[in-house]
Amino acid sequence: MPELPEVETIRRSLSQHILERRIEEILIRWPGAVEGYEEKTFADAVRGLKFQSIERRGKYLLFTLEEGWSFIAHMRMTGRMVYHAQSQEPEKHTHVVLKLSSGEIHFTDTRKFGRLQLVRTEERLQQPSLARLGPEPLEEGFSAAELGRRLAPRKLAIKAALLDQTLVAGIGNIYADEALFRAGIAPERCANSLTKEEIEKLYPAICQVLEEGIAANGTSFRDYQDANGERGDFQKELKVYGRGGEPCKECGHTLVRIRLAGRSTVFCPCCQV
């Protein structure tokens, strides 16, 4: 699933191409990919409108259109939004095509979990998907103290807490594993057992892995590509994620893979306590 760095990379790459471009036609090839309005109403509402801005909130993209309309896009497991300068034949799993005044956006999703939701702009932050999100980890209002305050009542594993989007928005399996490794914290530790010193290590570790992920244009294993169809490079920098059974790059001990909060989790039992 695209996490904060991947979604931010998609936002930046789309912004290069579509701002002030007009939606001339929308082709909905699978109606289940769109939400908010019936298929024809959805298409009629946005036809002729320009993209004014693209923002990110957690793992969601928020597209502001003219006349008070917005798209909320969530890629979920395998969703992709790719810009094509010239008209392209849709792939098998391309569910929505936005034909613009210059170029096209193809919304493609092999597993059919991703969605494009049409909402009134003034109502979008009240949508349940966005209203429940925690703070953005890379914004000024978030700090080690705020992270500690939010972890204090959490009686669950710290890895599970980091995956909870109401705690902090945008962190998923990849960056949770990497942040915990950098902070030297075992993923099974109870969230409310972390000391002030440990939280002061975890907070910058979260920020660093997310910032480095963005700088590397995200992590690509299978499906993820940016809006230009290019893969990310952060998979080359991963210390633990996806490396269960391999030696730790810091101490040489064998990395352990467990199942935690329903997700595969990899950590070093020597470096993380």
UniProtKB/Swiss-Prot annotation:
The active site is at 2 (schiff-base intermediate with dna), 3 (proton donor), 59 (proton donor), 263 (proton donor). Its cofactor is Zn(2+). Keywords: DNA damage, DNA repair, DNA-binding, Glycosidase, Hydrolase, Lyase, Metal-binding, Multifunctional enzyme, Zinc, Zinc-finger. Binds 1 zinc ion per subunit. GO terms for biological process: base-excision repair. DNA binds at residues 93, 111, 154. Gene3D superfamilies: 1.10.8.50, MutM-like, N-terminal. The keyword Lipid metabolism does not apply. SMART domains: Fapy_DNA_glyco (SM00898), H2TH (SM01232). GO terms for molecular function: 8-oxo-7,8-dihydroguanine DNA N-glycosylase activity; class I DNA-(apurinic or apyrimidinic site) endonuclease activity; damaged DNA binding; zinc ion binding. Its EC number is 3.2.2.23, 4.2.99.18. It catalyses: Hydrolysis of DNA containing ring-opened 7-methylguanine residues, releasing 2,6-diamino-4-hydroxy-5-(N-methyl)formamidopyrimidine; 2'-deoxyribonucleotide-(2'-deoxyribose 5'-phosphate)-2'-deoxyribonucleotide-DNA = a 3'-end 2'-deoxyribonucleotide-(2,3-dehydro-2,3-deoxyribose 5'-phosphate)-DNA + a 5'-end 5'-phospho-2'-deoxyribonucleoside-DNA + H(+). SUPFAM superfamilies: Glucocorticoid receptor-like (DNA-binding domain), N-terminal domain of MutM-like DNA repair proteins, S13-like H2TH domain. InterPro entries: DNA_glyclase/AP_lyase_DNA-bd, DNA_glyclase_Znf_dom_DNA_BS, Formamido-pyr_DNA_Glyclase, FPG_cat, MutM-like_N-ter, Ribosomal_uS13-like_H2TH, Znf_DNA_glyclase/AP_lyase, Znf_FPG/IleRS. A zinc finger (FPG-type) spans 239-273. PANTHER family: FORMAMIDOPYRIMIDINE-DNA GLYCOSYLASE. Involved in base excision repair of DNA damaged by oxidation or by mutagenic agents. Acts as a DNA glycosylase that recognizes and removes damaged bases. Has a preference for oxidized purines, such as 7,8-dihydro-8-oxoguanine (8-oxoG). Has AP (apurinic/apyrimidinic) lyase activity and introduces nicks in the DNA strand. Cleaves the DNA backbone by beta-delta elimination to generate a single-strand break at the site of the removed base with both 3'- and 5'-phosphates. Belongs to the FPG family. Monomer. This is Formamidopyrimidine-DNA glycosylase. It comes from Desulfitobacterium hafniense (strain Y51).
